[in-house]
Amino acid sequence: MSSSESSSASGGGPPDAEPSQTEQQTMPQLDTLISHLVAAKRSLSSINHVWRANEIVTTARAALEESVVVSARTGFLRRGLNNQLRLLYSVRTEVEEISLRGRSEFAAVLKDLDAADARLRRTLELLRETIVHGGFRPEGEQPRSLHDFVDERGVEELHAALKNSIDRTNGAQAQLDSSNHAFDDELLSIKEALGNYRAVAKLASSRSSSSPSSSSASNSSLPSMSSMPSMLHSLEMHAQEMANLLESLVRHFDLCVTAVKHTEGGGAAAKSITGDMHVGVNASGRIGPNIEEGINANLNAPLDPLSDSEYREMVHVLIKDATEAEDVVMEIHDRIGEMESSLENVLAQRDALRSIYNATIDVFQHLSSLASTRLPGYIAQAHDFTRVWHEENDRIAGGLDDLAHLNSFYDGFLDAYDGLIIEVARRRHVRQRVEKVLRDAKHKLDQLYEEDVNAREAFRVEKGDYLPSDIWPEVGREPMRIEFRRILGGKVKGAVSEQANDEEPTAGEREQRGGGQENHLSAVGDNTEVDEVIPELPRDLVEQVFARIQTRVKSTT
């Protein structure tokens, strides 16, 4: 249809030769020209597509600009979110390690504490089971166990202190667990937001990959931005080409109007056909000239005179262009359809970027809220647990030492009682040996005494009458007699200083002990004993003690 420009541009010239009769017969009739004018007028409805193309380009350009901004913001947020998420999970891991380490250490300490307490309780139970032999206690006293000589208030106070430490540690552990559970809930919420983000990104990627113009975006979590400028450029080219096509349709319409007006009887018909044309939208802009002004100018312009040859050439061009006008209209329609499809892809990518940005903002808001309000509390709770555990761990360690000391002390008490029984048996044996020595000595002394008495009596009978009584006054005296004296032993050297501040024994106690530091026995054979009392223990009791001592020695070696 470009040939219409050259034909319609000739405003007049020298008249050509008269047309032949054949040419006059082949010239189209007015009805034919009017039908071409009506068709040309109808083709001008494509101006709506041109206006729409202009809107599409404007919308696509705005969408591209918005997409660039949103994509940049999303990329910036994603980089920040990745760093924050790594930091957040590092904090959660460290807090969990504090909890697990504290729980493990606490469990180990409790195990040691239970073992130490079990040993102490076994020792106390042995004290309860060990009955003091009646020979060590006053006559008539109710049987007593070794446990009766133990003051358990220290054990109870130690248990109470340990229980307080355990309760405080358990409380701190429970608070840390509660804090960690809340932390996990926060992470779960963030995971849900991240899941929504991934779902949106996956959906956007699938939509982007389904577009022929953005096939490279199928493996990306964000729609491809590289395809959008080319789309916009393609839209601009389509719009410009549509404007050019519309201009050709306008020129064809102008040519039809001019041809009808120059045809006899066509002026009124042209006015009737074009009288109702109103172009209410200004289509001027980057994509073409002001079409409204051009149409109105052509409709109202005065007719220029044409020669017959010019008229014939104009009609020839008109008929030729009329065959192409429908193709031009179809091309405009096809181009606007392709532009609509491209715009749909551009808007879909923009909407996908918006969705991803909104999902990213949602995750960022979760992280920001967590970091600014609750995360410091979770970290502080871990520090509080560490502080409490260190304090109570030291106290429990001291309690373990105290339990071990008490257990050792009570074990020593049991061992000392066994040693006391052995000591009593030893003293009893020594006493028996002393008594034997005394009996043997008494027997020999009695023999010597009798021999001496008999010898003196024989001497007196034989020589006494011849000796004056004053020659040796002792000559008639009986031999001396030997009496043994038992002396109550004093305190053992080491026990003297320990008992220095003890109260003095009462008179009854002194009488029970023998009446004083010394005790004279009337005779060796006197059975009345007023010195130290050594209990007489059953042989099987002593043997049991020996067996326990041997077992204890084996267990320690």
Curated annotation (Swiss-Prot):
Protein's membrane topology: Peripheral membrane protein
UniProt keyword annotations, A-Z: Autophagy, Coiled coil, Cytoplasm, Membrane
Annotated localization: Cytoplasm; Preautophagosomal structure membrane
GO biological process, one term: autophagy of mitochondrion
GO molecular function, one term: protein kinase activator activity
Low complexity: compositionally biased ranges: 205-227
GO cellular component, one term: phagophore assembly site membrane
Pfam families in the cross-refs: ATG17_like (PF04108)
Coiled coil: 334-355, 428-458
Chain segments carrying region Disordered: 1-25, 204-227, 495-532
Known role: Autophagy-specific protein that functions in response to autophagy-inducing signals as a scaffold to recruit other ATG proteins to organize pre-autophagosomal structure (PAS) formation. Modulates the timing and magnitude of the autophagy response, such as the size of the sequestering vesicles. Plays particularly a role in pexophagy and nucleophagy.
PANTHER family: AUTOPHAGY-RELATED PROTEIN 17
Family statement: Belongs to the ATG17 family.
Name this polypeptide is given: Autophagy-related protein 17
Originating organism: Aspergillus clavatus (strain ATCC 1007 / CBS 513.65 / DSM 816 / NCTC 3887 / NRRL 1 / QM 1276 / 107)
Lineage, opening ranks: Eukaryota, Fungi, Dikarya, Ascomycota, Pezizomycotina
